[in-house]
Amino acid sequence: MLGRLLISIVIACMGFAGVAQAQNKAELLWYSQAAFKLTTQNGKVILIDPWIMGAPLTPPELKNLDAIGKVDLILVTHGHGDHIGDALELSKKHDVPIWAPAGLNQTLLTLGLMPSKLVPRMNKGGIIEPFPGVKITMVRAEHSSEMVLKDPASGKDTTFFAGEPVGFIIELENGFKIYHMGDTGLFGDMKMIGEYYKPDLLLVPIGGHFVMNPKDAAYATKELIKPKMAWPMHYASNPMLRGTPAQYKEAMGQTSIEILDVKPGDKKQF
């Protein structure tokens, strides 16, 4: 009798654990601009373009690198300051790699700013599987990429080549796919990216001037990529980024794509 009772308890516990695991969801926290903290279903933490401390629209309560907690991986789409942001400090602090365009990481290594183990090389079309069930693919973006850094030799601010800009397709443990576009203008291969990778969620820049404006972003979303959901980003952090979520939503018109109503500091689960 006791044996049957113990077996029943074990089976019940196994069933409960399975339900709990099935209920795990990924969580995406938006700091502002293109900076996100992605926590996967299995609890791995990925930072994307972590411009946090210097970003004017990041909520004050989030301007604390210690409050991020653990970090397992950092993705950087290109070398501009509003994307590489706090990546170097966070990489060293947590002893985790920065995955970025090969030319960007090569420059950091050549200048002696980062140890080789923290700046592995990767390029467009490259795929990494850093954790069980998680796959990250580097894809094209249409932008530029350079870094303004202090030259170790002269001590002067100097502009350095930082590879070519990219975006990332992040596939999570349950198959959910996120396409972080980085900074980009319109380009025809967005259609191929949409057809081939079939992203569920699109993180899309809408501010204009340096990236797509709301009209261009809506065309990319609705006609080329066709995700299930869209998260407008990269606007209002300086006077030239004039595009707004309202303009983007208007340009989208009637659509089955869910346009997320989000502001810096918001979290969503998927």
Language-model features: locations:
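Active-site-proximal loop/helix segments of hydrolase catalytic cores
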Residues: 150, 154-223, 247
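Beta-strand-turn-beta hairpins that frame and shape the catalytic cleft
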Residues: 23-26, 40-46, 127-137, 171-178, ...
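Pre-active-site segment of Zn-dependent metallo-hydrolases
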Residues: 40-81, 85-92, 106, 115, ...
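Zn-dependent metallo-beta-lactamase
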Residues: 2-45, 52-54, 254, 264-266
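Extracytoplasmic
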Residues: 31-33, 41, 69, 93, ...
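Active-site environment of divalent metal-dependent phosphoester hydrolases
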Residues: 54-55, 81-85, 105-108, 126-128, ...
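Active-site neighborhood of phospho(di)ester-bond hydrolases with catalytic His/Asp-centered motifs
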Residues: 47-49, 71-79, 99-102, 178-184, ...
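Binuclear metal-ion centers of metallo-dependent hydrolases, dominated by the metallo-beta-lactamase
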Residues: 97-98, 109-130, 218-270
